[in-house]
C-alpha cells in the first residue's frame, strides 16, 4: 500500500512536470522537452552555439527551448532582432529573475547592478545616471583619450620588454582594459601586479566560465540542486570577494572625497546619495552601488580585452591586412605624437578592420538574457509575459545576405566600392535597443586608440613554431580566443606616445 502511494505521487509529480513543459498556444516551435531537464540534452554543455544554429535551420529564426521547466525563445536574424529589440523594445526589455546569473549575487536580488536589473523606473534612472556621469568624465572627449593613451604607454613598455621573445598577450590586454575603466570608476590606475586587479580579473574570468558552463545550466534546469555544495558555489564566493574589495574602495572615497567636487564615478554616486538623502528609499543605495560598479568593471574589461586578443590574432595571421593598416596609419598621422579618436574619420580601412574584428570576435554571442514585460507577439507568434528571450547575435553577425563574406575575416565587409567605411545594419555586437551595452562608445574609443597606437610602433608576428592558428573560441559569458603567443618587432619608424 505504501509503495503504491509513493508510486502514485511520483506519477503525479512527473505528470505536473510534463504539463509545465508544454508550449503555450501559438508559441514558437522547438524540440520536444524532457521533464525536469527540458531541452538541456539538445545543447552541448561546452559550446551550445553550434546547436543553436542547428535548431535555427530546423525550426526557423524564432524557435523555443525549455531551460528546465522554463520556456525560452531564441531569436535569430536581423529582421527578428529589429522587431524585438527596437520596434517592440519595451515589450522585450525585461530581465529574467530566476536564473543562475541573477542568483549568484550575494545580496538581495532587488539590489543588483544595472546589467541584470529588470526593466523599471529604477533601472531607467540608473542608466540615465551612468550615461550622464560617463559624459561628464570625458567619454568621447579629449580627457578620455588622454586616459587611454596614458594606459597604452604601459602596454608599450610591456611589448618593448618582450621584443625577441615569444609571449602571451592575454594578461597584458586584460590589465590594460581593466585599468582604463578603473580610472573612470575609481579615479586611479593600478600596477599590473596589484592585488585588486589580479583578484578582480581572476574572479570575473572564473565566473564567466561558470555562468555559461554545465553547472550553471544544471542550476537553472534542476532547482532542487541549488543549495548543494556543487562547483557553481565558487561563483558566489567570487562575487563576495569582489564585493569586499569594492566596499573598501567606497570607504576610502568617503574619507577622502570633497562633496560636490567628484573625481570619479564613485564620487558622483556618493554625491547623488547625499542629494537624495533618506527620501529615496532603495533606488540609490550603497549595496546597489557595489553591484553597479562590478557590472561596469566587468563589461568594460572582458569584452574589450577579448576583442583585442581576437584582433591581434587575426592581424598576425593576415600580415597583408596588418601592413595595409600600418600604411594608412602612417599616412594619416605623419609626424604627430599620437592618434586622436577623431582620426577614425580619415582611416576607413582601419575602421573596417576594427569592426570586422568585433564581428568575428562576437564576444557576447547570446547577449544578456531578456524577458518579455507584457504579453506580446513576435513574427506572428504569441509570447506570454515573463518569457525568457535569448538573442543569438552570431546569427546576425554571420547572416547570409547581410555580409559580402559572412564566414571569413575580411574588412571588405565594411567597405563600399569606393573604399569608404560603411556599417551594415546587421552589425550588432552590443545588441540593440534601450538595453544596448552602456560602454559601447568607450569600447570603440579604446579599440581604435590601442590598435592604431600599437600598430604604428610594432609589427606583430605569428611565431614560426606555433603551428596553424586556431580561431575556435573558448565559450563563456564572453567568447575569448584560445590561448596563443605572439612575437613583436619594432617598426622602422619610431614614435612616442606622451602621457
Where does each model-flagged region fall?
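Terminal signal-anchor or tail-anchor transmembrane helices
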Residues: 1-23
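Cytochrome P450 substrate-recognition site 1
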Residues: 24-43, 50-144, 168, 173-183, ...
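Classical protein tyrosine phosphatase
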Residues: 27-30, 74-84, 91-93, 187-192, ...
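Conserved cytochrome P450 K-helix E-x-x-R motif and the immediately C-terminal K′/meander segment
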Residues: 40-60, 244, 338-380, 387, ...
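Cytochrome P450 heme-thiolate monooxygenase catalytic core
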Residues: 95-106, 121, 141-308
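Cytochrome P450 heme-binding "Cys pocket" and the immediately downstream C-terminal segment
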Residues: 319-321, 440-478
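Cytochrome P450 heme-thiolate "Cys pocket" and heme-binding signature region
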Residues: 379, 417-447, 472-474
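Conserved cytochrome P450 K-helix/beta-meander segment immediately N-terminal to the heme-binding cysteine loop
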Residues: 391-419
Amino acid at each position: 500500500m505504501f509503495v503504491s502511494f509513493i508510486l502514485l505521487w511520483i506519477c503525479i509529480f512527473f505528470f505536473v512536470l510534463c504539463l509545465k513543459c508544454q508550449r503555450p498556444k501559438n508559441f514558437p516551435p522547438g524540440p520536444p522537452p524532457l521533464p525536469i531537464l527540458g531541452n538541456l540534452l539538445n545543447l552541448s554543455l561546452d559550446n551550445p552555439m553550434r546547436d543553436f544554429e542547428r535548431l535555427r535551420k530546423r525550426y526557423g529564426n524564432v524557435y523555443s527551448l525549455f531551460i528546465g521547466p522554463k520556456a525560452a525563445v531564441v531569436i535569430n536574424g536581423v529582421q527578428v532582432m529589429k522587431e524585438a529589440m527596437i520596434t517592440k523594445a519595451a515589450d522585450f526589455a525585461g530581465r529574467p529573475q530566476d536564473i543562475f546569473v541573477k542568483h549568484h549575487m550575494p545580496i538581495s536580488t532587488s539590489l543588483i547592478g544595472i546589467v541584470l536589473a529588470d526593466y523599471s523606473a529604477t533601472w531607467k534612472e540608473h542608466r540615465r545616471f551612468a550615461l550622464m556621469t560617463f559624459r561628464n568624465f570625458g567619454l568621447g572627449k579629449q580627457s578620455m583619450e588622454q586616459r587611454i593613451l596614458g594606459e597604452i604607454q604601459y602596454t608599450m613598455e610591456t611589448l618593448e620588454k618582450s621584443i625577441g621573445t615569444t609571449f602571451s598577450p592575454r594578461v597584458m590586454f586584460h590589465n590594460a582594459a581593466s585599468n582604463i575603466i578603473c580610472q573612470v570608476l575609481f579615479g586611479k590606475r593600478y600596477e599590473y601586479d596589484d592585488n585588486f586587479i589580479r583578484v578582480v580579473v581572476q574572479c570575473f574570468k572564473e565566473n564567466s566560465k561558470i555562468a555559461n558552463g554545465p553547472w550553471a545550466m544544471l542550476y537553472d534546469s534542476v532547482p532542487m540542486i541549488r543549495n548543494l555544495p556543487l562547483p557553481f558555489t565558487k561563483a558566489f564566493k567570487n562575487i563576495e570577494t569582489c564585493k569586499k574589495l569594492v566596499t573598501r574602495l567606497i570607504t576610502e572615497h568617503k574619507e577622502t572625497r570633497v562633496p560636490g567636487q567628484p573625481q570619479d564615478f564613485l564620487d558622483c554616486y556618493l554625491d547623488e546619495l547625499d542629494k537624495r538623502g533618506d527620501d529615496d528609499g532603495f533606488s540609490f543605495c550603497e549595496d546597489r552601488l557595489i553591484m553597479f560598479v562590478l557590472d561596469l568593471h566587468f563589461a568594460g574589461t572582458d569584452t574589450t580585452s577579448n576583442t583585442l586578443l581576437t584582433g591581434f590574432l587575426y592581424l598576425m595571421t593576415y600580415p597583408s591586412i596588418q601592413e595595409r593598416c600600418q600604411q594608412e596609419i602612417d599616412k594619416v598621422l605623419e609626424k604627430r605624437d599620437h592618434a586622436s579618436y577623431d582620426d577614425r574619420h580619415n582611416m576607413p580601412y582601419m575602421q573596417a578592420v576594427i569592426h570586422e574584428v568585433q564581428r568575428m570576435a562576437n564576444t557576447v554571442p547570446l547577449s544578456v538574457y531578456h524577458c518579455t514585460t507584457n504579453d506580446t507577439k513576435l513574427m506572428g507568434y504569441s509570447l506570454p509575459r515573463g518569457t525568457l528571450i535569448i538573442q543569438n547575435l552570431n546569427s546576425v553577425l554571420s547572416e547570409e545576405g547581410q555580409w559580402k563574406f559572412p564566414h571569413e575575416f575580411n574588412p571588405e565587409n565594411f567597405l563600399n566600392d569606393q573604399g569608404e567605411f560603411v556599417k551594415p545594419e546587421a552589425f550588432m555586437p552590443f545588441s540593440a535597443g534601450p538595453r544596448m551595452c552602456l560602454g559601447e562608445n568607450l569600447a570603440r574609443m579604446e579599440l581604435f586608440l590601442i590598435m592604431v597606437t600599437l600598430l604604428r610602433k610594432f609589427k606583430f608576428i605569428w611565431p614560426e613554431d606555433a603551428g596553424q592558428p586556431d580561431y575556435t573560441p573558448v565559450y563563456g559569458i564572453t567568447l575569448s580566443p584560445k590561448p596563443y603567443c605572439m612575437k613583436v618587432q619594432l617598426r622602422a619608424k619610431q614614435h612616442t606616445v606622451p602621457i
